[in-house]
Design a protein with these regions (language model features):
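WD40-repeat beta-propeller superdomains and closely related acidic/aromatic-rich repeat-like regions
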Residues: 1-332
Length: 332
């Protein structure tokens, strides 16, 4: 299921419904399976393209963080119960490989190192922790954030970890000495609403393009009424080396939206998924303009996405209980 990419021809190819609203999703490395999480605290494994479903029980709360191992043999999940679970997902009956107590409270994001040996996790306890993928042993923890940490990524060469928090601070950690090297300013993603006594926004998602030396960070701005879901999606384009803001990407007409995840396409196009009271959108950006170069309206509020580069396929997890698979090329 792959043709030449054309974002203007993006269309939904498959959709499968679960019993409860979905939260997160990831595509297996081979593109033949999609994992999702639901508000009933379970995980789901869906075959692609058939849509056959298996349900995994193990968490005691919602799961926002999902990652496959580099070989696709295991799925790792981080829950709001503070637990990280490794699952064998190629077995006829998928099972728990190990479960650890990882954080005090919500786990917001996890990432697997490029060599597949290390897992990074972050959450509401403001800690960055590294774990052995093979044993679950804690390798180290790093402190330095002042608020909840929402996002984490590894540099493709494995030398650094980046973590983004509620205040719009992106910390860059040097893994050679496991110390904070520098901080990138992404504070346009942070909002303080004194009338509602609320801090809102933050670096909800990040993606690094080494060839372009650019980091994109997604979230929201113009949060005039956070509790009323009035806030608009925003993506920042930052220089990785010095943190200079190169461009702010905003979207007209989406008055209730937040960018939950961002990724790069191989041609350098940045993609974000927005979900909120205005609905769900796939948003496409390049460096030529601040507004999106294309938007694809999804049928329902979206909470997460994952792109499979080899097949030009996008999975999205939706509040209307659906996992949807969209193709970024013309219908055949």
């Amino acid at each position: 299921m792959s043709s030449a990419i054309d974002i203007t021809k993006t269309h939904i190819a498959y959709q499968w419904k679960y019993d409860r609203p979905l939260i997160a999703c990831r595509i297996a490395p081979d593109g033949l399976q999609v994992a999702s999480s639901s508000e009933d605290s379970t995980l789901q494994l869906w075959t692609v393209p058939g849509g056959e479903k298996k349900v995994l029980n193990g968490h005691e709360s919602w799961v926002h963080a999902l990652r496959y191992s580099t070989d696709g043999g295991q799925l790792v999940s981080g829950g709001c119960d503070g637990k990280i679970i490794w699952w064998s997902v190629r077995d006829e009956s998928p099972s728990i490989v190990r479960k650890i107590d990882a954080h005090a409270g919500w786990i917001r994001d996890i990432a697997v190192s490029p060599d597949g040996n290390t897992l990074a996790s972050v959450g509401n306890d403001k800690m960055v922790r590294l774990w052995s993928m093979s044993s679950g042993e804690k390798l180290c923890e790093m402190a330095g954030h002042e608020r909840h940490i929402y996002s984490v990524l590894f540099h493709p060469d494995g030398s650094h970890v980046a973590t983004g928090d509620l205040l719009g601070k992106i910390h860059i950690w040097d893994l050679s000495d496991r110390k904070l090297e520098r901080t990138i300013d992404a504070t346009p993603l942070y909002a303080e609403n004194k009338g509602q006594s609320a801090e809102f926004g933050g670096v909800r998602a990040m993606a690094l393009n080494v060839e372009r030396n650019e980091l994109i960070a997604g979230g929201t701005h113009k949060a005039t009424n956070p509790f009323g879901a009035v806030h608009e999606p925003l993506v920042l384009r930052l220089n990785w080396s010095d943190g200079v803001l190169k461009k702010s990407h905003s979207c007209e007409g989406i008055t209730g939206g937040l960018v939950w995840r961002v990724q790069w396409l191989v041609d350098g196009t940045a993609v974000g998924v927005s979900g909120g009271s205005t609905g769900g959108f796939l948003l496409f950006f390049n460096d030529s303009q601040e507004k999106e170069i294309h938007r694809f309206k999804l049928p329902s509020l979206a909470r997460d996405m994952d792109i499979h580069q080899a097949s030009n396929m996008v999975a999205t997890a939706h509040h209307d209980n659906h996992i949807r698979i969209s193709c970024m090329f013309a219908k055949e």
